[in-house]
Amino acid sequence: MSEPTLRLSGIEKTYLSGTPGEVRVLRGVDLSVEPGEMVALVAPSGAGKSTLLHISGLLDVPDAGRVEIAGQDMTGRGDRARTGVRRRDVGFVYQFHHLLPEFTALENVVLPQLANGIGEGEARARARALLSRVGVEGRAGHRPAALSGGEQQRVAFCRALANAPRLLLADEPTGNLDPATSDQVFDALVELVRGTGLSALIATHNLELAARMDRVVRLSDGRLSAES
């Protein structure tokens, strides 16, 4: 049996706050995401889903517990090791696209690959293939300001997958879009995930979109529970 792409075991996280002093955001969270699986993470605002995603993607460190990415236990690993695994195995998508405004759509997908040591020819070919898969290959030469919100987010998906990660983490990826565009963009995300076979943990307030994923988990009062 293959290893889960992401395994969280006993994750704890507490933040200091003026009042009441400490906020215990995550309380013994356990979660596994299998290869090729799409898992929806639903939670009310402020419940800690962004914190959970940041810990899952090695952008933050839990106070206790273990994070494993593709079988690699990251407990106690230094910044260099964590950065290496994050760059190689994890892709991120946020509510706002965060594309570099001075570069074209194609260049935004090429740049992460160049930073990862991939040759320019190969990087451009992969970028064009990804953009084509989500239907924006005709916009490859446009800068973000010339793209619609839906197009910007599709390019952001492609950038997140540019280095062929094993795990995609998405924080409200359609939250800034109107309902019709949100559905179209989500369809594009599903096409990318299913077409590449990676695993995805996607935080969303949209329960209709969540229901279209393989599994739904809910974060409430710092604890994770399965909905389906």
Swiss-Prot record:
InterPro entries: AAA+_ATPase, ABC_transporter-like_ATP-bd, ABC_transporter-like_CS, ABC_transpr_LolD-like, MacB-like_ATP-bd, P-loop_NTPase. Transmembrane segments: none annotated. GO terms for cellular component: plasma membrane. Pfam families: ABC_tran. The keyword Membrane applies. Keywords: ATP-binding, Cell inner membrane, Cell membrane, Membrane, Nucleotide-binding, Translocase, Transport. GO terms for biological process: lipoprotein localization to outer membrane; protein localization to outer membrane. GO terms for molecular function: ATP binding; ATP hydrolysis activity; transmembrane transporter activity. Its EC number is 7.6.2.-. ATP binds at A43, P44, S45, G46, A47, G48, K49, S50. Its main location: membrane. CDD domains: ABC_MJ0796_LolCDE_FtsE. The complex is composed of two ATP-binding proteins (LolD) and two transmembrane proteins (LolC and LolE). Belongs to the ABC transporter superfamily. Lipoprotein translocase (TC 3.A.1.125) family. Part of the ABC transporter complex LolCDE involved in the translocation of mature outer membrane-directed lipoproteins, from the inner membrane to the periplasmic chaperone, LolA. Responsible for the formation of the LolA-lipoprotein complex in an ATP-dependent manner. This is Lipoprotein-releasing system ATP-binding protein LolD. The gene is lolD.
